[in-house]
């Protein structure tokens, strides 16, 4: 896993993103920092616990389309590149 990550202002500097609770925004950044080089996170619940977030924040990111879930619990960040 790389040690440097970049986040696009086209994603995080929008009303749609900024209207989310700060806890959901924080989760998005932490997931991005821990994603593999293709944007996949194999243990999102571990990261939730690690930063003191909750399932509602994850649900918000999924509902708004920032994350794509897989049946095995893995998620991918949609706007990864």
Residues of each region from the PLM?
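Detector for short helical micro-motifs
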Residues: 2-81
């Amino acid at each position: 896993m790389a040690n440097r990550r970049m986040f696009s202002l086209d994603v995080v500097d929008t009303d749609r993103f900024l209207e989310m609770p700060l806890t959901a925004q924080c989760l998005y950044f932490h997931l991005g920092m821990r994603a593999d080089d293709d944007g996949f996170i194999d243990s999102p619940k571990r990261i939730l616990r690690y930063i003191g977030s909750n399932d509602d924040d994850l649900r918000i990111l999924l509902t708004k389309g920032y994350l794509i879930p897989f049946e095995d619990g893995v998620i991918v960040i949609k706007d990864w590149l």
